[in-house]
């Protein structure tokens, strides 16, 4: 079972809900829930086959890119820098699973 992947998905999902409660951005909530769902489904697929990392890798790369750009623009660690950093770590972990 890919506990790290499921934890990452839960963090993304929880973060989108928390962001919605603080700021009230419905599009951000929908996007966060969708990306969290993709990350969770990707973790499920990795749980079944350790080499099936395509969806998880795509999701982490997408989130790292989007949040990395936000971090570069805002210079704020929370939440953009944290999510970008965690996504980069997730990418590294997934690539290592392929080796």
Swiss-Prot record:
InterPro entries: TMEM14, TMEM14_sf. GO terms for biological process: negative regulation of apoptotic process; negative regulation of mitochondrial outer membrane permeabilization involved in apoptotic signaling pathway; regulation of heme biosynthetic process. It is a multi-pass membrane protein. Keywords: Endoplasmic reticulum, Membrane, Mitochondrion, Transmembrane, Transmembrane helix. One of its GO terms (cellular component) is endoplasmic reticulum membrane. The chain crosses the membrane at residues 1-21, 24-44, 79-99. It is found in: Mitochondrion membrane; Endoplasmic reticulum membrane. Inhibits apoptosis via negative regulation of the mitochondrial outer membrane permeabilization involved in apoptotic signaling pathway. Belongs to the TMEM14 family. This is Transmembrane protein 14A. It comes from Sus scrofa.
């Amino acid at each position: 079972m890919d506990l790290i992947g499921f934890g990452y998905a839960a963090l993304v999902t929880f973060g989108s809900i928390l962001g919605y409660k603080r700021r009230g951005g419905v599009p951000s909530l929908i996007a966060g829930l969708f990306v969290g769902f993709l990350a969770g489904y990707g973790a499920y697929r990795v749980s079944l086959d350790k080499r099936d990392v395509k969806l998880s890798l795509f999701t982490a790369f997408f989130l790292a890119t989007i949040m990395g750009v936000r971090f570069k623009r805002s210079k704020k660690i929370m939440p953009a820098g944290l999510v970008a950093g965690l996504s980069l770590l997730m990418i590294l972990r997934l690539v290592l699973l392929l080796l």
